[in-house]
Swiss-Prot record:
Recorded GO MF terms: DNA binding; DNA-binding transcription factor activity; RNA polymerase II cis-regulatory region sequence-specific DNA binding; zinc ion binding
Lineage per the UniProt record: Eukaryota, Metazoa, Ecdysozoa, Arthropoda, Hexapoda
Ranges of compositional bias, category Polar residues: 213-222
Record field: compositional bias (Low complexity): 223-248, 447-462
CC terms in the record's Gene Ontology section: nucleus
General function of this protein: Transcription factor required for terminalia development. Negative regulator of the JAK/STAT pathway: represses JAK/STAT-dependent expression of ventral veins lacking (vvl) in the posterior spiracles.
Domain BTB: 33-101
GO BP field: female analia development; female genitalia development; male analia development; male genitalia development; regulation of DNA-templated transcription; regulation of transcription by RNA polymerase II
Keyword Metal-binding: yes
Sequence segments annotated as region (Disordered): 179-276, 304-336, 438-462
Name of the protein this chain belongs to: Transcription factor Ken
Species: Drosophila pseudoobscura pseudoobscura
Keywords: Developmental protein, DNA-binding, Metal-binding, Nucleus, Repeat, Repressor, Transcription, Transcription regulation, Zinc, Zinc-finger
PANTHER family assigned: B-CELL LYMPHOMA/LEUKEMIA 11 (PTHR45993), TRANSCRIPTION FACTOR KEN (PTHR45993:SF7)
């Protein structure tokens, strides 16, 4: 049995809205206008053939009878005022226009000339349109408020039901002929609640299936009701007053009056271009703000409680530091001036007193310091003989002799503490005798003390004590080369440089890692698909089986080539 494929219907929900926006934008910018209308006094107006041909049978017949190769067509109306034709274009493109009451007859005659026929019109005569549409033309400068109960019969059908339902539609004005104006001095001027009538209102495409009703109903939002009733007698006597009339399409009540609209005649019912969808809401066709999204809706609301985010384990995200280009930052000239770390003798004494547990490794030092403090040792009894020194160090500490100095106090004297040491005359006289004795210290320890670093005990129990302190930040290190490497953080010195790029490093290990990772394609050589990769030196012709061998080769044989000072060689 043959299977039939199901038919799918694709619907574009915003199709009508997009068409209206495009046609409105084309009308405002007159692009691409392919129809030129020459009115009285040779005033030219630009429009589109598609819109006018769909609305006017006269224009459609002229375009069908005249076959022109040129894309632009000119139609002459020498007896038609350009102002009224401009109102007509606003009405056809946007579905509504704002005119004065005495211009309705002229506009209707123009509609009859273009064979645009309709049995039902809807007009709105409102007092508050005087304030909003007062600057339409120069002749409408002085306006008077009209009565709320003022009725005008214009020889057309009046629909009283639509008057009450469509009172909110009376505030919509044309974008090009309606500007915001201050309230008039006379009474009866209404203040519009929503600022819907702006200088640049959105125009929509004229729908040929819409019914144009003619009705004259007062608006429901008039503020000064008592003043309007008091001035109604004066306004009735002045029949020549210019009263603006809103001539708009019935967009909001189409669904409610569908039965009545089927019986009425439509504009351009015989045209082939009258198939535009009518499912467009009134807010999208009359309000500019309805065609765009509100920006405040896209703003996320702040969370009420931030503790849930902080306590959630999914939010512990570790973001790596941005890798800066090496060699172009932290130069010698950009370093901030550092102040040396000031040693405090009292803090050192408190640190020593906090370690109350006896340590066997410091027994000999405590014994010697105790004898020095009490005068038991002097320069005559001390000899350079090492056996005598060792025998002296093997004596047990006497419990009767108090220990005034900590075990680490001897090994934390620095050159910047000479002033504190000189303040102790009793201890300074005893220490002067130690300069003549040979304690058998290793030369490495003496060299470190000469450089201004701290010397610790040589026994294995004190190996974990950090001996070398940074003069800038006070950080301690157990090895002298670690302190030397750390000082480059403060000084900005980068003694190692890559010869293959501009990178500079503070440590040799960082440079070797850079060579093996960034420049891996340079040091890697391939002898074939079956053989393993070999690593060649970038400074000579030697090759190695592993990266570790290449690193040892670069660190040993080409150590001078890794230094920044030898870049010019």
């Amino acid at each position: 049995m043959k299977e039939f494929q199901r038919m799918l219907m694709l619907q574009y929900s915003k199709h009508g809205e997009c068409i209206l926006k495009e046609i409105g934008a084309a009308f405002r910018g007159e692009h691409p206008a392919d129809l030129t209308i020459v009115c009285e006094n040779k005033v030219k107006l630009h429009a589109h053939k598609l819109v006018l041909a769909a609305a006017s049978p006269l224009i459609r017949n002229l375009l069908e009878d005249t076959h022109l190769s040129d894309c632009s067509t000119t139609v002459y109306f020498p007896d038609v005022n350009a102002t009224y034709f401009k109102f007509l274009l606003d009405f056809l493109y946007s579905g509504q226009t704002c005119i004065t009451s005495r211009d309705v007859n002229y506009l209707h005659d123009l509609l009859l000339l273009l064979q645009i026929k309709s049995d039902s019109w809807k007009t709105t005569d409102s007092a508050y349109l005087n304030s909003k549409c007062g600057s339409i033309r120069e002749r409408s400068r002085k306006q008077y408020s009209s009565s709320q109960n003022l009725d005008q019969t214009l020889k057309y059908e009046v629909d009283s039901v639509d008057e009450s339902r469509n009172a909110a539609d009376f505030s919509a004005c044309s974008a090009e002929h309606c500007e915001s104006a201050p309230e008039c001095g006379g009474g009866g001027v209404a203040k519009e609640e929503d600022d819907e009538c702006t200088h640049k209102d959105n125009r929509s495409e004229k729908d040929t299936d819409e019914i144009v009703n003619l009705s004259n109903a007062p608006p429901s939002g008039i503020s000064n009701h008592s003043n309007t009733n008091s001035n109604s007698s004066n306004n009735n006597n002045n029949n020549s007053a210019i009263n603006p009339v809103n001539l708009s399409l019935d967009l909001r009540t189409k669904s409610e009056n569908s039965a009545r609209s089927d019986a009425s005649r439509t504009i351009g019912s015989g045209s082939d271009h009258s198939g535009i969808d009518l499912a467009i809401s009134a807010s999208e066709s009359t309000k500019r703000k309805g065609l765009f999204f509100d920006s405040h809706k896209d703003v996320l609301k702040p969370l009420s409680d931030g503790s849930d985010i902080n306590s959630s384990p999914e939010n512990y995200v570790v973001t790596p530091h941005r890798k800066r280009r090496p060699g172009f930052h932290n130069t010698q000239s950009d370093n901030q001036p550092f102040t040396s770390y000031q040693q405090n003798l009292l803090e050192e004494l408190r640190l020593v007193k906090s370690t109350t547990s006896p340590i066997s490794g410091f027994s000999s030092e405590k014994n010697m310091l105790a004898h020095l403090e009490d005068g038991a040792l002097n320069g005559d009894t001390l000899t350079p003989d090492r056996k005598l020194i060792e025998s002296q160090r093997n004596h047990a500490q006497s419990p009767d002799i108090p220990m005034h100095l900590g075990p680490q106090f001897v090994y934390q004297w620095q050159s910047n503490q000479n002033a504190a040491i000189s303040a102790m005359p009793n201890l300074q006289s005893r220490l002067s005798s130690l300069s003549h004795m040979n304690l058998g210290l290793d030369p490495e320890g003496r060299s470190s003390s000469a450089s201004g670093s701290n010397i610790a005990s040589s026994n294995p129990h004190s190996s974990s004590v950090r001996e070398y302190r940074c003069e800038y930040c006070g950080k301690q290190f157990g090895m002298s080369w670690n302190l030397k490497t750390h000082l480059r953080v403060h000084t900005g010195e980068k003694p190692f440089a890559c010869r293959l790029c501009v990178a500079m490093f503070k440590q040799k290990a960082h440079l070797l890692k850079h060579l093996c990772s960034v420049h891996r394609n340079i040091i890697t050589t391939t002898n074939g698909t079956d053989t393993e990769n070999r690593y060649s030196c970038c400074f000579c012709s030697m090759c190695f089986e592993s990266v570790q061998e290449l690193v040892r080769h670069l660190s040993g044989h080409h150590n001078n080539l890794l230094l920044t000072k030898n870049l010019r060689e």
